Amino acid sequence: MIEPFKVKDVEIGGPKLFLIAGPCVIESEAHAMKMAEAISGVCKAMKIPYIFKASYDKANRTSLSSFRGPGLHEGLRILAKVADEVNVPVLTDVHDTEQATAAGDIVDVLQIPAFLCRQTDLLVAAAKTGKVVNVKKGQFVAPNDMQYAVTKVRESGNQRVCLTERGASFGYNNLVVDMRALPIMRQFAPVIFDATHSVQLPSAGKDGHAVSGGQPEFIPVLSRAAVAAGVDGVFMEVHDDPPHAKSDGANALDLKLLRGVLTSLLRIREAVTPPAAS
């Protein structure tokens, strides 16, 4: 039985479905603020607990020439402003122990990227900040093996850890979601479904360019399946203009579609939630 915990006013692992959403990368201060305010507005109207996400550095872009973000210090300044002015918890990913320490002073949730989910020093450093640690399951990792990442965080003195499913490698340049992973991982910690990276086509390329592709048309159906399977929260990269996003636009959800997707998710959540004991 998992124990719920809180990120400010957002309960993780409780009865309410929550949303983690924002642009893939911080494109500018103005854009980060715009997206946080827009998504927060939708979530407030729908009474959905919300955590803003954005990266200050996309360290594993396919091409050296791809936009990576504003960097650690400027990115953390912008995330702090989002948290303060929009009044929402914020999440960002960290790639080494020094970043974990610095980001832990600012953000509410430290995310361990899927490619780094087995890096013990990074897990321990993130745990020791005392902030919530969200570990993404590697595309190459069995769901049951994620219990070891959870144990590393907890044995470092931090009980606030959750896991995120983002698809498994399926041949070359493709991912598939095995919904069995969700209840398996939920034996160990609260589970989040990454609805947008799960439809990514890694390094698939487009018109000869070294970029990842995506199939965003499958975001709604996979999200619905994950909520039906009992996830605690949903993670989405949301953008107001996906074709011109500076990172991962090919698999982002268009902001104008967000409310409709969330409406269906809430209906499913209500349908699969057992009635409260009288």
UniProtKB/Swiss-Prot annotation:
A molecular function annotated in GO for this UniProt entry is: 3-deoxy-8-phosphooctulonate synthase activity
Which GO biological process annotations does it have? keto-3-deoxy-D-manno-octulosonic acid biosynthetic process
Q: What is its EC number?
A: 2.5.1.55
Q: Where in the cell is it found?
A: Cytoplasm
Q: Which UniProt keywords apply?
A: Cytoplasm, Lipopolysaccharide biosynthesis, Transferase
Its recorded reaction(s) are: D-arabinose 5-phosphate + phosphoenolpyruvate + H2O = 3-deoxy-alpha-D-manno-2-octulosonate-8-phosphate + phosphate
Pathway(s) per entry: Carbohydrate biosynthesis; 3-deoxy-D-manno-octulosonate biosynthesis; 3-deoxy-D-manno-octulosonate from D-ribulose 5-phosphate: step 2/3; Bacterial outer membrane biogenesis; lipopolysaccharide biosynthesis
User: Which enzyme class, named as a word?
Assistant: transferase
| InterPro entries assigned | Aldolase_TIM (IPR013785), DAHP1/KDSA (IPR006218), KDO8P_synthase (IPR006269)
Family of this protein: Belongs to the KdsA family.
**Which NCBIfam families does its entry note?**
KDO8P_synth (TIGR01362), PRK05198.1 (NF003543)
Protein name from the UniProt record:
2-dehydro-3-deoxyphosphooctonate aldolase
What is the species of this protein? Koribacter versatilis (strain Ellin345)
